[in-house]
Amino acid sequence: MSIESDMIHVEVVYALPHEQRVFNLVVNNHATVEEIIRQSGVLELYPEIDLAKNKVGVFSRNVKLDATVRDKDRIEIYRPLLADPKEIRRKRAEQAKAAGNADPVTGGKPNALRK
């Protein structure tokens, strides 16, 4: 086997609210997700990334740090959620009920046929 056939092209992506960083790398085809992220330099540029806490994925599918990748894969580092989506929906429904924009029983849209 040649050295070139042992190498693959991958991207490491980290997105912030107003910035997206893409790191293009050529790595060994047996490298793990964690090794590739460390090689990319993203951890030095963004010290807030903690691989023990931040989830990672390949093309929007969660993967473990010890997973291997294929040629042309995109490794994504996800930021933690700021708020629980269920809690946000519950608060929004309560506000709609209080404002009279929701059915007081179901919490959904008011039914004009119901009295």
Swiss-Prot record:
The similarity comment for this entry is: Belongs to the UPF0125 (RnfH) family.
Q: Which Pfam families match?
A: Ub-RnfH
Where is the region Disordered?
92-115
| Name of the protein this chain belongs to | UPF0125 protein VP0646
- Domain of life where this protein originates: Bacteria
